[in-house]
């Protein structure tokens, strides 16, 4: 049976390959906080001005991808923390849903492929690796 933690059994890069040049987790968390704040300020500014807010699809996907990858990395680094596992599973699903809705997948297999049964975590690795950090 495929193992979403190690990536064994999936046609996707294993964590060591997908995240080989990823920033350290603390730096990535700080960068994600900044990106999240910027997106929230844009939404609030549009709301205050009474204008419709259309989030930048590219920035939104980048945020989701980086968040899902960080959660995956945290879950791998700290397998004893169930909350990290739950976050990794949930955020991988959110990225896959976004990519389905917006047709923004970059990798060999799209988010709806049977390849990702039973988990989208390897999908996150495929997409992160394709990103080319």
State the predicted function of each range.
Residues 1-63, 74-133:
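Long, non-catalytic architectural segments outside compact domain cores
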């Amino acid at each position: 049976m495929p193992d979403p933690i190690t990536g064994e059994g999936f046609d996707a890069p294993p964590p060591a390959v997908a995240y080989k040049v990823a920033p350290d987790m603390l730096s990535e968390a700080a960068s994600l906080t900044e990106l999240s704040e910027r997106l929230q300020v844009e939404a609030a500014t549009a709301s205050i001005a009474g204008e419709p807010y259309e989030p930048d699809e590219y920035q939104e996907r980048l945020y989701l991808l980086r968040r899902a990858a960080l959660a995956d990395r945290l879950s791998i680094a700290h397998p004893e923390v169930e909350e990290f596992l739950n976050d990794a599973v949930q955020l991988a699903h959110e990225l896959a849903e976004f990519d389905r809705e917006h047709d923004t997948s970059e990798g060999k297999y799209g988010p709806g492929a049977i390849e990702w049964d039973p988990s989208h975590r390897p999908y996150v690795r495929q997409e992160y690796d394709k990103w080319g950090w």
